[in-house]
Protein backbone atom coordinates (compact mmCIF):
# COMPACT_ATOMS: atom_id res chain seq x y z
CA UNK A 1 0.00 0.00 0.00
CA UNK A 2 0.98 3.61 -0.36
CA UNK A 3 2.26 4.69 3.08
CA UNK A 4 0.67 8.10 2.58
CA UNK A 5 -2.72 6.37 2.86
CA UNK A 6 -4.10 5.50 6.30
CA UNK A 7 -5.04 1.84 6.72
CA UNK A 8 -8.61 1.76 7.97
CA UNK A 9 -9.95 -1.30 9.74
CA UNK A 10 -13.72 -1.86 9.71
CA UNK A 11 -15.66 -0.32 12.58
CA UNK A 12 -16.83 -2.60 15.38
CA UNK A 13 -20.52 -2.67 14.54
CA UNK A 14 -22.46 -0.20 16.68
CA UNK A 15 -19.62 0.38 19.12
CA UNK A 16 -18.85 4.06 19.59
CA UNK A 17 -17.75 4.36 23.24
CA UNK A 18 -15.35 1.95 24.96
CA UNK A 19 -14.63 1.96 28.69
CA UNK A 20 -11.42 0.49 30.16
CA UNK A 21 -11.40 -0.72 33.77
CA UNK A 22 -7.77 -0.46 34.90
CA UNK A 23 -6.81 1.82 32.02
CA UNK A 24 -3.48 2.78 33.61
CA UNK A 25 -2.06 -0.73 33.27
CA UNK A 26 0.80 -1.37 30.86
CA UNK A 27 -1.31 -3.66 28.71
CA UNK A 28 -4.42 -1.47 28.72
CA UNK A 29 -3.26 2.08 28.06
CA UNK A 30 -1.74 1.27 24.67
CA UNK A 31 -4.90 -0.37 23.36
CA UNK A 32 -6.94 2.56 24.62
CA UNK A 33 -4.64 5.01 22.84
CA UNK A 34 -4.81 3.17 19.51
CA UNK A 35 -8.61 2.97 19.67
CA UNK A 36 -8.77 6.67 20.58
CA UNK A 37 -6.66 7.47 17.53
CA UNK A 38 -9.03 5.39 15.40
CA UNK A 39 -11.88 7.69 16.41
CA UNK A 40 -13.63 5.79 19.20
CA UNK A 41 -14.73 7.62 22.35
CA UNK A 42 -12.58 6.22 25.15
CA UNK A 43 -13.14 6.45 28.87
CA UNK A 44 -11.40 4.60 31.66
CA UNK A 45 -10.85 4.25 35.36
CA UNK A 46 -7.93 3.39 37.59
CA UNK A 47 -7.14 3.26 41.28
CA UNK A 48 -4.69 6.14 41.32
CA UNK A 49 -2.97 8.92 39.44
CA UNK A 50 0.11 8.01 37.40
CA UNK A 51 2.20 9.25 34.52
CA UNK A 52 0.23 6.94 32.24
CA UNK A 53 -3.09 8.39 33.40
CA UNK A 54 -1.79 11.91 32.85
CA UNK A 55 -0.63 11.01 29.35
CA UNK A 56 -4.03 9.54 28.43
CA UNK A 57 -5.75 12.68 29.68
CA UNK A 58 -3.39 14.82 27.59
CA UNK A 59 -4.72 12.95 24.55
CA UNK A 60 -8.28 13.88 25.46
CA UNK A 61 -9.28 10.59 27.09
CA UNK A 62 -11.53 10.84 30.16
CA UNK A 63 -9.95 8.92 33.06
CA UNK A 64 -11.69 8.57 36.42
CA UNK A 65 -9.83 7.83 39.64
CA UNK A 66 -11.65 5.13 41.57
CA UNK A 67 -14.13 2.53 40.36
CA UNK A 68 -17.80 3.57 40.43
CA UNK A 69 -20.77 2.32 38.47
CA UNK A 70 -21.49 5.78 37.02
CA UNK A 71 -18.10 5.70 35.25
CA UNK A 72 -19.44 3.33 32.59
CA UNK A 73 -22.26 5.67 31.50
CA UNK A 74 -22.57 5.63 27.70
CA UNK A 75 -20.23 2.67 27.20
CA UNK A 76 -21.04 0.18 24.43
CA UNK A 77 -18.38 -2.27 25.62
CA UNK A 78 -16.25 -2.57 28.75
CA UNK A 79 -12.66 -3.83 28.58
CA UNK A 80 -11.35 -5.49 31.74
CA UNK A 81 -7.73 -5.71 32.84
CA UNK A 82 -6.72 -9.15 34.11
CA UNK A 83 -5.78 -7.40 37.37
CA UNK A 84 -9.40 -6.30 37.90
CA UNK A 85 -11.70 -8.49 39.99
CA UNK A 86 -15.09 -9.57 38.63
CA UNK A 87 -16.66 -8.01 41.73
CA UNK A 88 -15.46 -4.58 40.62
CA UNK A 89 -18.51 -2.26 40.71
CA UNK A 90 -18.03 -1.19 37.09
CA UNK A 91 -17.89 -4.81 35.91
CA UNK A 92 -20.96 -5.70 37.99
CA UNK A 93 -22.88 -2.68 36.66
CA UNK A 94 -21.94 -3.43 33.04
CA UNK A 95 -23.22 -6.99 33.33
CA UNK A 96 -26.47 -5.84 34.92
CA UNK A 97 -26.93 -3.41 32.02
CA UNK A 98 -26.06 -6.19 29.52
CA UNK A 99 -23.04 -4.27 28.25
CA UNK A 100 -20.44 -6.72 26.88
CA UNK A 101 -17.45 -7.15 29.22
CA UNK A 102 -14.36 -8.48 27.45
CA UNK A 103 -10.75 -9.16 28.49
CA UNK A 104 -7.98 -6.89 27.30
CA UNK A 105 -6.62 -9.54 24.93
CA UNK A 106 -9.98 -9.89 23.16
CA UNK A 107 -9.88 -6.21 22.23
CA UNK A 108 -6.25 -6.54 21.15
CA UNK A 109 -7.27 -9.48 18.95
CA UNK A 110 -10.05 -7.38 17.41
CA UNK A 111 -7.55 -4.63 16.58
CA UNK A 112 -5.35 -7.26 14.94
CA UNK A 113 -8.13 -9.07 13.04
CA UNK A 114 -7.97 -7.06 9.82
CA UNK A 115 -4.26 -6.25 10.04
CA UNK A 116 -0.98 -8.05 9.38
CA UNK A 117 -0.40 -9.01 13.00
CA UNK A 118 3.07 -9.65 14.39
CA UNK A 119 2.87 -11.05 17.93
CA UNK A 120 5.90 -11.30 20.21
CA UNK A 121 5.63 -13.94 22.95
CA UNK A 122 7.98 -15.49 25.49
CA UNK A 123 8.59 -15.50 29.22
CA UNK A 124 11.44 -12.98 28.94
CA UNK A 125 12.35 -10.32 26.39
CA UNK A 126 8.89 -9.64 24.97
CA UNK A 127 8.87 -5.91 25.56
CA UNK A 128 12.36 -5.28 24.20
CA UNK A 129 11.80 -7.51 21.16
CA UNK A 130 8.42 -5.91 20.39
CA UNK A 131 10.10 -2.50 20.61
CA UNK A 132 12.94 -3.58 18.33
CA UNK A 133 10.59 -5.02 15.70
CA UNK A 134 8.46 -1.86 15.77
CA UNK A 135 11.55 0.34 15.46
CA UNK A 136 13.03 -1.58 12.52
CA UNK A 137 9.75 -1.62 10.60
CA UNK A 138 9.36 2.12 11.21
CA UNK A 139 12.94 2.78 10.08
CA UNK A 140 12.22 0.75 6.94
CA UNK A 141 9.24 2.95 6.07
CA UNK A 142 6.56 0.37 6.90
CA UNK A 143 4.93 2.67 9.49
CA UNK A 144 3.48 -0.03 11.77
CA UNK A 145 0.99 0.31 14.57
CA UNK A 146 2.24 -1.15 17.84
CA UNK A 147 1.19 -1.90 21.40
CA UNK A 148 4.06 -2.59 23.80
CA UNK A 149 4.17 -3.41 27.51
CA UNK A 150 6.77 -0.70 28.16
CA UNK A 151 7.48 2.85 27.05
CA UNK A 152 9.54 3.11 23.85
CA UNK A 153 12.08 5.81 24.70
CA UNK A 154 12.29 7.16 21.16
CA UNK A 155 8.65 8.28 21.16
CA UNK A 156 7.85 8.34 24.87
CA UNK A 157 4.84 6.04 24.41
CA UNK A 158 3.96 2.37 24.42
CA UNK A 159 1.51 2.55 21.53
CA UNK A 160 1.13 4.15 18.15
CA UNK A 161 -1.35 4.03 15.29
CA UNK A 162 0.62 3.75 12.08
CA UNK A 163 -0.63 4.17 8.55
CA UNK A 164 0.13 0.65 7.31
CA UNK A 165 -1.63 -2.66 8.00
CA UNK A 166 1.33 -3.94 10.05
CA UNK A 167 0.50 -4.30 13.73
CA UNK A 168 3.19 -5.33 16.25
CA UNK A 169 2.00 -6.45 19.68
CA UNK A 170 3.35 -7.95 22.85
CA UNK A 171 1.57 -11.27 23.46
CA UNK A 172 0.96 -12.05 27.14
CA UNK A 173 1.26 -15.63 28.37
CA UNK A 174 0.80 -14.73 32.05
CA UNK A 175 -2.95 -15.45 31.91
CA UNK A 176 -2.82 -17.45 28.64
CA UNK A 177 -4.63 -14.53 26.97
CA UNK A 178 -2.26 -14.64 24.00
CA UNK A 179 -4.49 -17.47 22.77
CA UNK A 180 -7.01 -14.79 21.73
CA UNK A 181 -4.57 -13.59 19.07
CA UNK A 182 -4.41 -14.81 15.48
CA UNK A 183 -1.31 -13.12 14.04
CA UNK A 184 0.32 -13.58 10.65
CA UNK A 185 3.80 -13.77 12.19
CA UNK A 186 4.85 -14.74 15.71
CA UNK A 187 8.07 -14.71 17.71
CA UNK A 188 8.71 -16.88 20.77
CA UNK A 189 11.81 -15.73 22.64
CA UNK A 190 11.87 -18.44 25.34
CA UNK A 191 9.68 -20.58 27.60
CA UNK A 192 10.36 -20.50 31.34
CA UNK A 193 8.52 -21.25 34.58
CA UNK A 194 6.51 -18.17 35.54
CA UNK A 195 2.83 -17.48 36.26
CA UNK A 196 2.52 -21.20 36.94
CA UNK A 197 -0.78 -20.73 38.78
CA UNK A 198 -2.31 -20.03 35.34
CA UNK A 199 -1.05 -23.43 34.19
CA UNK A 200 -2.01 -25.32 37.37
CA UNK A 201 1.67 -25.76 38.22
CA UNK A 202 2.12 -27.98 35.15
CA UNK A 203 5.11 -27.00 33.01
CA UNK A 204 3.99 -29.34 30.23
CA UNK A 205 0.74 -27.37 30.04
CA UNK A 206 2.74 -24.14 29.74
CA UNK A 207 4.85 -25.63 26.97
CA UNK A 208 1.87 -26.94 25.00
CA UNK A 209 0.06 -23.60 25.39
CA UNK A 210 2.95 -21.87 23.61
CA UNK A 211 2.67 -24.48 20.86
CA UNK A 212 -1.06 -23.82 20.63
CA UNK A 213 -0.31 -20.09 20.33
CA UNK A 214 1.97 -20.77 17.34
CA UNK A 215 -0.73 -22.90 15.74
CA UNK A 216 -3.01 -19.84 15.76
CA UNK A 217 -0.88 -18.69 12.84
CA UNK A 218 -2.43 -19.42 9.43
CA UNK A 219 -0.85 -22.25 7.45
CA UNK A 220 1.01 -19.63 5.41
CA UNK A 221 2.13 -17.65 8.46
CA UNK A 222 5.61 -17.60 9.98
CA UNK A 223 6.96 -18.62 13.38
CA UNK A 224 10.32 -17.17 14.46
CA UNK A 225 11.76 -18.97 17.49
CA UNK A 226 14.96 -18.88 19.55
CA UNK A 227 17.22 -21.89 19.09
CA UNK A 228 19.11 -21.10 22.31
CA UNK A 229 16.13 -22.01 24.49
CA UNK A 230 15.89 -25.66 25.54
CA UNK A 231 12.12 -25.64 25.88
CA UNK A 232 11.64 -24.15 22.42
CA UNK A 233 13.92 -26.86 21.03
CA UNK A 234 11.62 -29.43 22.63
CA UNK A 235 8.50 -28.14 20.88
CA UNK A 236 10.28 -27.30 17.61
CA UNK A 237 9.57 -30.67 15.91
CA UNK A 238 5.87 -30.27 16.72
CA UNK A 239 5.44 -26.81 15.17
CA UNK A 240 3.26 -27.31 12.11
CA UNK A 241 3.82 -23.90 10.59
CA UNK A 242 6.64 -22.40 8.49
CA UNK A 243 9.42 -21.73 11.00
CA UNK A 244 12.68 -19.81 11.15
CA UNK A 245 15.16 -20.01 14.02
CA UNK A 246 17.65 -17.56 15.47
CA UNK A 247 20.54 -17.78 17.89
CA UNK A 248 24.29 -18.33 18.17
CA UNK A 249 24.20 -21.95 17.00
CA UNK A 250 25.49 -22.78 13.54
CA UNK A 251 22.20 -24.35 12.48
CA UNK A 252 20.16 -21.20 13.22
CA UNK A 253 18.67 -19.48 10.18
CA UNK A 254 19.60 -16.09 11.66
CA UNK A 255 22.89 -16.44 13.51
CA UNK A 256 25.03 -14.01 15.51
CA UNK A 257 28.80 -14.39 15.24
CA UNK A 258 31.78 -12.38 16.49
CA UNK A 259 29.82 -10.75 19.31
CA UNK A 260 31.76 -8.27 21.44
CA UNK A 261 30.65 -6.00 24.26
CA UNK A 262 32.41 -2.63 24.59
CA UNK A 263 30.77 -0.80 27.44
CA UNK A 264 27.11 -0.38 26.52
CA UNK A 265 27.83 -1.09 22.84
CA UNK A 266 27.02 -4.56 21.50
CA UNK A 267 28.63 -5.39 18.16
CA UNK A 268 28.09 -8.58 16.17
CA UNK A 269 27.68 -9.97 12.67
CA UNK A 270 24.40 -11.54 11.54
CA UNK A 271 24.52 -14.46 9.13
CA UNK A 272 21.19 -14.70 7.28
CA UNK A 273 19.64 -17.20 4.86
CA UNK A 274 20.57 -16.79 1.19
CA UNK A 275 20.30 -14.55 -0.74
CA UNK A 276 20.57 -12.08 2.15
CA UNK A 277 24.08 -10.88 2.93
CA UNK A 278 25.73 -10.68 6.34
CA UNK A 279 25.17 -7.53 8.38
CA UNK A 280 27.45 -5.89 10.92
CA UNK A 281 25.31 -4.65 13.79
CA UNK A 282 26.05 -2.11 16.50
CA UNK A 283 23.51 -1.11 19.12
CA UNK A 284 23.53 0.38 22.59
CA UNK A 285 21.87 -2.44 24.48
CA UNK A 286 24.15 -4.76 26.42
CA UNK A 287 24.02 -8.47 27.11
CA UNK A 288 23.73 -11.79 25.34
CA UNK A 289 19.95 -11.79 25.83
CA UNK A 290 19.65 -8.51 23.94
CA UNK A 291 21.70 -9.86 21.04
CA UNK A 292 19.06 -12.59 20.80
CA UNK A 293 16.25 -10.02 20.97
CA UNK A 294 17.93 -8.09 18.16
CA UNK A 295 18.24 -11.26 16.05
CA UNK A 296 14.50 -11.88 16.33
CA UNK A 297 13.78 -8.35 15.13
CA UNK A 298 16.26 -8.68 12.27
CA UNK A 299 14.55 -11.89 11.16
CA UNK A 300 11.09 -10.27 11.11
CA UNK A 301 12.36 -7.12 9.36
CA UNK A 302 14.26 -9.13 6.74
CA UNK A 303 11.26 -11.36 6.01
CA UNK A 304 9.07 -8.27 5.55
CA UNK A 305 11.51 -6.77 3.05
CA UNK A 306 13.09 -4.03 5.15
CA UNK A 307 16.31 -3.02 3.39
CA UNK A 308 19.68 -3.77 4.96
CA UNK A 309 20.64 -0.14 5.58
CA UNK A 310 17.41 0.47 7.48
CA UNK A 311 18.00 -2.60 9.67
CA UNK A 312 21.54 -1.50 10.53
CA UNK A 313 20.50 2.12 11.06
CA UNK A 314 17.42 1.19 13.09
CA UNK A 315 19.49 -0.81 15.57
CA UNK A 316 22.11 1.94 15.80
CA UNK A 317 19.39 4.48 16.59
CA UNK A 318 17.47 2.26 19.03
CA UNK A 319 17.10 4.16 22.31
CA UNK A 320 15.77 1.30 24.39
CA UNK A 321 12.67 0.79 26.50
CA UNK A 322 11.73 2.30 29.83
CA UNK A 323 12.88 0.25 32.83
CA UNK A 324 14.92 -2.20 30.74
CA UNK A 325 18.54 -1.70 31.88
CA UNK A 326 17.79 2.03 31.80
CA UNK A 327 20.60 4.30 32.98
CA UNK A 328 19.02 7.13 34.95
CA UNK A 329 22.28 8.95 35.57
CA UNK A 330 25.05 9.36 38.13
CA UNK A 331 24.38 10.73 41.61
CA UNK A 332 26.53 11.76 44.54
CA UNK A 333 26.10 9.94 47.85
CA UNK A 334 27.88 10.69 51.13
CA UNK A 335 30.90 8.52 50.33
CA UNK A 336 31.04 8.76 46.54
CA UNK A 337 29.21 8.90 43.22
CA UNK A 338 27.28 5.98 41.73
CA UNK A 339 25.44 5.26 38.49
CA UNK A 340 21.76 4.34 38.96
CA UNK A 341 20.26 1.74 36.62
CA UNK A 342 16.53 0.96 36.63
CA UNK A 343 15.35 -2.47 35.47
CA UNK A 344 12.00 -4.28 35.32
CA UNK A 345 13.46 -7.79 35.76
CA UNK A 346 11.56 -9.80 38.35
CA UNK A 347 12.28 -13.44 37.47
CA UNK A 348 15.52 -15.26 38.43
CA UNK A 349 16.50 -15.72 34.78
CA UNK A 350 16.05 -12.00 34.16
CA UNK A 351 18.21 -11.24 37.19
CA UNK A 352 20.93 -13.55 35.85
CA UNK A 353 20.80 -11.93 32.39
CA UNK A 354 20.96 -8.43 33.88
CA UNK A 355 23.89 -9.25 36.16
CA UNK A 356 25.72 -10.87 33.23
CA UNK A 357 25.17 -7.71 31.17
CA UNK A 358 26.37 -5.58 34.09
CA UNK A 359 29.62 -7.59 34.39
CA UNK A 360 30.27 -7.12 30.67
CA UNK A 361 29.58 -3.37 30.71
CA UNK A 362 31.33 -2.55 34.01
CA UNK A 363 33.72 -5.43 34.78
CA UNK A 364 35.67 -3.37 37.34
CA UNK A 365 32.74 -1.81 39.17
CA UNK A 366 30.85 -3.01 42.23
CA UNK A 367 27.19 -3.96 41.88
CA UNK A 368 24.92 -2.67 44.65
CA UNK A 369 21.69 -4.51 43.92
CA UNK A 370 18.39 -3.20 45.31
CA UNK A 371 15.75 -5.85 44.57
CA UNK A 372 12.02 -5.84 45.25
CA UNK A 373 10.49 -9.33 44.89
CA UNK A 374 7.22 -9.31 42.95
CA UNK A 375 4.30 -11.55 44.01
CA UNK A 376 4.24 -14.09 46.83
CA UNK A 377 3.46 -16.97 44.47
CA UNK A 378 6.49 -16.27 42.27
CA UNK A 379 8.77 -15.83 45.28
CA UNK A 380 7.56 -19.15 46.69
CA UNK A 381 7.67 -21.25 43.51
CA UNK A 382 11.08 -19.93 42.39
CA UNK A 383 12.65 -19.58 45.84
CA UNK A 384 15.76 -21.66 45.08
CA UNK A 385 16.36 -19.88 41.77
CA UNK A 386 16.02 -16.47 43.44
CA UNK A 387 18.60 -17.46 46.06
CA UNK A 388 21.03 -18.59 43.36
CA UNK A 389 20.58 -15.46 41.22
CA UNK A 390 20.62 -12.86 43.99
CA UNK A 391 23.73 -14.41 45.55
CA UNK A 392 25.70 -13.11 42.55
CA UNK A 393 25.35 -9.45 43.60
CA UNK A 394 28.26 -7.74 45.35
CA UNK A 395 25.94 -5.97 47.82
CA UNK A 396 22.27 -6.94 48.11
CA UNK A 397 19.59 -4.65 49.52
CA UNK A 398 16.32 -6.56 49.67
CA UNK A 399 12.90 -4.92 49.93
CA UNK A 400 9.64 -6.46 51.11
CA UNK A 401 7.66 -8.46 48.58
CA UNK A 402 5.42 -6.36 46.33
CA UNK A 403 2.07 -8.16 46.57
CA UNK A 404 0.58 -7.08 43.21
CA UNK A 405 -2.86 -7.80 44.64
CA UNK A 406 -1.97 -11.22 46.05
CA UNK A 407 -2.69 -12.39 49.59
CA UNK A 408 0.41 -13.02 51.70
CA UNK A 409 1.57 -16.64 51.96
CA UNK A 410 2.77 -17.68 55.45
CA UNK A 411 6.53 -18.13 55.53
CA UNK A 412 7.10 -16.45 52.16
CA UNK A 413 9.00 -13.30 53.09
CA UNK A 414 12.02 -11.31 52.00
CA UNK A 415 13.60 -12.05 55.39
CA UNK A 416 13.46 -15.80 54.73
CA UNK A 417 14.97 -15.23 51.30
CA UNK A 418 17.69 -13.08 52.87
CA UNK A 419 18.52 -15.69 55.51
CA UNK A 420 19.17 -18.36 52.91
CA UNK A 421 21.38 -16.01 50.90
CA UNK A 422 23.26 -15.12 54.10
CA UNK A 423 23.93 -18.83 54.65
CA UNK A 424 26.18 -18.57 51.59
CA UNK A 425 28.35 -15.98 53.35
CA UNK A 426 26.71 -13.10 51.49
CA UNK A 427 25.69 -9.85 53.19
CA UNK A 428 22.03 -8.96 52.75
CA UNK A 429 20.35 -5.84 54.14
CA UNK A 430 16.58 -5.52 54.40
CA UNK A 431 15.51 -2.00 53.42
CA UNK A 432 12.29 -0.05 53.05
CA UNK A 433 11.51 2.90 50.83
CA UNK A 434 11.99 5.13 53.87
CA UNK A 435 15.40 3.70 54.82
CA UNK A 436 16.78 3.26 51.29
CA UNK A 437 18.53 6.63 50.94
CA UNK A 438 20.28 6.40 54.32
CA UNK A 439 21.36 2.82 53.62
CA UNK A 440 22.80 3.78 50.24
CA UNK A 441 24.67 6.69 51.85
CA UNK A 442 26.25 4.13 54.16
CA UNK A 443 27.05 1.53 51.49
CA UNK A 444 27.98 3.42 48.34
CA UNK A 445 31.61 3.83 47.35
CA UNK A 446 32.83 5.99 44.51
CA UNK A 447 32.36 4.21 41.17
CA UNK A 448 29.63 1.81 42.28
CA UNK A 449 26.59 0.99 40.15
CA UNK A 450 23.18 0.76 41.83
CA UNK A 451 20.77 -1.63 40.12
CA UNK A 452 17.17 -0.90 41.16
CA UNK A 453 15.27 -3.97 40.00
CA UNK A 454 11.73 -5.33 40.18
CA UNK A 455 8.28 -5.07 38.62
CA UNK A 456 6.54 -3.26 41.49
CA UNK A 457 6.94 0.20 42.96
CA UNK A 458 10.74 0.18 42.85
CA UNK A 459 10.79 1.89 39.45
CA UNK A 460 9.22 5.02 40.93
CA UNK A 461 11.64 4.78 43.87
CA UNK A 462 14.54 4.89 41.42
CA UNK A 463 13.11 8.01 39.78
CA UNK A 464 12.54 9.61 43.19
CA UNK A 465 16.07 8.75 44.25
CA UNK A 466 17.42 10.67 41.26
CA UNK A 467 15.09 13.64 41.79
CA UNK A 468 15.51 14.08 45.52
CA UNK A 469 19.27 14.02 45.76
Swiss-Prot record:
Uppermost EC category: ligase
Repressor recorded as keyword: no
GO molecular function per UniProt: ATP binding; UDP-N-acetylmuramate-L-alanine ligase activity
Pathway(s) served: Cell wall biogenesis; peptidoglycan biosynthesis
Family matches, as Pfam families: Mur_ligase (PF01225), Mur_ligase_C (PF02875), Mur_ligase_M (PF08245)
EC number: 6.3.2.8
Entry annotated with the keyword Zinc-finger: no
Name the UniProt record assigns to this protein: UDP-N-acetylmuramate--L-alanine ligase
Amino acid sequence: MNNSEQFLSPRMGRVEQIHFVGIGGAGMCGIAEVLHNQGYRITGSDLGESGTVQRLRSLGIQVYIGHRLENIKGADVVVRSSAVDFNNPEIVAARELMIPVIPRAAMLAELMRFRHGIAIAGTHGKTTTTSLVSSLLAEGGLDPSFVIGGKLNSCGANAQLGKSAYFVVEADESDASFLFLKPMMAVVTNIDADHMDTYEGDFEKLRTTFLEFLHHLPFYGLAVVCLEDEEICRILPAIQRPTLTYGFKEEAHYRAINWTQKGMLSEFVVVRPAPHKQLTIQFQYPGRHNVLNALASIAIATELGVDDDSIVRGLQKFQGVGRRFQMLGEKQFEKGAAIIVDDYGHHPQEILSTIDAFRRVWPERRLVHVFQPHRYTRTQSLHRQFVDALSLSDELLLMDIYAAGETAIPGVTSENLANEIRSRDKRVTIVSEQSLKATLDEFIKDGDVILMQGAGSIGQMAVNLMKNM
